[in-house]
Amino acid sequence: MANTKSAKKRIRSDARKHLRNQSYRSRVKTMIKKAELALANGVVDEAALRMAYSTLDKAAVKGIIHKNNAARRKSRLAQKAKKVALAAQAGSAA
C-alpha cells in the first residue's frame, strides 16, 4: 500500500488513465469490427474505414497503442478492403 501522499495521488491518477485508455482501446476495437463487418458482407464502406483509420491514428498519437501497431492494423484493413473491391469488380465484370 502506498505510504506517501504523492504515491497515493499516483495510484488515483493511474486509475483514471487506465479507464481512459481502456475506453479508447474499446473504441478502436469497435471501429475495426464495424469496418470488418462491412467488408465481410462484401461492401467497401469508406466511412467505416475512414473512422477506423482515424481512431487508430488518434490512439497512436495519444500513446494508447504503439504507432507500428496502428500502422499494422490499418494495413490489414486496407488489404481486406482491396480484396473485397477487386472481388466486387471481378463480379460486376463477369
Curated annotation (Swiss-Prot):
GO terms for biological process: translation. InterPro entries: Ribosomal_bS20 (IPR002583), Ribosomal_bS20_sf (IPR036510). One of its GO terms (cellular component) is cytosol. Signal peptide: none annotated. Residues 1-23 are annotated as: Disordered. The keyword Metal-binding does not apply. It comes from the Bacteria. Binds directly to 16S ribosomal RNA. Belongs to the bacterial ribosomal protein bS20 family. This is Small ribosomal subunit protein bS20. It comes from Chloroflexus aurantiacus (strain ATCC 29366 / DSM 635 / J-10-fl). The lineage of its organism: Bacteria, Bacillati, Chloroflexota, Chloroflexia, Chloroflexales.
